[in-house]
């Protein structure tokens, strides 16, 4: 069954002001699907995700849910329903787990009931975070910080999650657990996923395309 395209890029070029890092990239992410981008360090995988979000210089055509987003600011892309979970986890280390999660819902700060519901939903996926909700994020293990980064992205109620190397630096059992939960998020919450990954075996097992 072919899926309708949620995200579509055509002839995408990206740079940080110097030579182009991405040249003429075209791809689609199906609505409700999981698409994987594989490649070694330095291949431009992280730049691809940043280009979608407007975090670097770009040209080409990028459409999300039928809207052109190649000229939109990062915050406007986020408001459309794109959650970017960067490599290095990107958590605010001095804040508690729960404060980090609430920051993830900053675009919906008036929706107190919905935010409370979504907190319980992510704690259902990641029970360890519930145990550590009052703990400073900087004292969490690497695996817990990755769970927190994914959960913070979920607090946006995204249509699409961009995941940058979620397995990096983590023990294999923790990685398997995180990938299992990502599949559940995809299937139960109907969140599409664009996954950048070096671990080809795990990534291809998770992906539709």
Where are these regions (language model features)?
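Glycine-rich phosphate-binding loops of nucleotide-dependent enzymes
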Residues: 4-209
